[in-house]
């Protein structure tokens, strides 16, 4: 056997070893629900998008019930710019007026959602695109953001327009889909009882869905490896109390704070464990679920 044949044999042996070692994890998650929040750089990279779709297809084929929730901030900003719609910001947060929320719904529940559905379907599965309006799945209320002025230390409440937070989740439709061959792909748009449409932060939306489904795992695909310590080293596992302390001592800071707070709330609402992982790593979902070392920061109660 020459060097080329040896090399090919080694590759096949490694693939076989991975499949063999993955079996206990596949059995662990069989018939369980895994919610995956898809966002960040991975959404803008065609190769990563195809790898993600293949991961989701493999989960379904392994007897797992995946539910995908996606964001789309950069794509919304791009369409607003093309349409000549100027955004107004309060403390760095976009104010979503009536015209903008129409664009948000068009982009999130329309083009982005259907692109993800098509990617998963191309892998031989049946994905279906939905948002909070479908089947009265999610109802939202207007969200208010409280900020403290750094100079005066006066607390101020920001009105961000048609930005909402989920207050009711009906799992009926998702349970029906879990019993079928369908994979739900959810856009974070929902109605209010007031008849208005609200744009919801995708992380918060995913947390609410995972909590309502009492998911085995909630995975957040991000642009970072996970939660890092002050030396930049990945923290492999955290409890809620440990995460709270890391927020207090500012080890966890900036945009990671609301993400970790969403993780903690999901755990309190019945999710078994939450993982923050790097969506820029191809097949990170499989690495997290089907290997001993995982692929990010595991947060548990």
Curated annotation (Swiss-Prot):
It is an enzyme of class 2 (transferase). Gene3D superfamilies: Acetylglutamate kinase-like. InterPro entries: AceGlu_kinase-like_sf (IPR036393), AcgluKinase_fam (IPR004662), ArgB (IPR037528), Asp/Glu/Uridylate_kinase (IPR001048), Glu/AcGlu_kinase (IPR001057), NAGK-C (IPR041727). Its EC number is 2.7.2.8. GO terms for molecular function: acetylglutamate kinase activity; ATP binding. Pathway: Amino-acid biosynthesis; L-arginine biosynthesis; N(2)-acetyl-L-ornithine from L-glutamate: step 2/4. GO terms for biological process: arginine biosynthetic process via ornithine; L-arginine biosynthetic process. It is found in: Cytoplasm. It comes from the Bacteria. The record marks 37, 259 as: Transition state stabilizer. Substrate binds at residues 72-73, 94, 199. It catalyses: N-acetyl-L-glutamate + ATP = N-acetyl-L-glutamyl 5-phosphate + ADP. Its main location: cytoplasm. CDD domains: AAK_NAGK-C. Keywords: Amino-acid biosynthesis, Arginine biosynthesis, ATP-binding, Cytoplasm, Kinase, Nucleotide-binding, Transferase. Belongs to the acetylglutamate kinase family. ArgB subfamily. This is Acetylglutamate kinase. It comes from Bartonella henselae (strain ATCC 49882 / DSM 28221 / CCUG 30454 / Houston 1).
